[in-house]
């Protein structure tokens, strides 16, 4: 999982 995707979910 990419950090960008995690930040996008939040």
Swiss-Prot record:
Keywords of the record: Amphibian defense peptide, Antibiotic, Antimicrobial, Secreted
Tagged with keyword Secreted: yes
Task performed by this protein: Has antibacterial activity against E.coli HP101BA (MIC=12.3 uM), K.pneumoniae PTCC1388 (MIC=9.8 uM), M.luteus PTCC1625 (MIC=8.3 uM) and S.aureus PTCC1431 (MIC=10.6 uM). Has no or very limited (<3%) hemolytic activity at concentrations of 15 ug/ml and 60 ug/ml, respectively.
Gene Ontology annotations of biological process type: defense response to bacterium
GO cellular component terms attached to this protein's record: extracellular region
Protein name (Swiss-Prot/TrEMBL): Temporin-ECa
Subcellular location: Secreted
Tissue specificity as recorded in UniProt: Expressed by the skin glands.
Homology family: Belongs to the frog skin active peptide (FSAP) family. Temporin subfamily.
């Amino acid at each position: 999982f990419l950090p960008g995707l995690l930040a996008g979910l939040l």
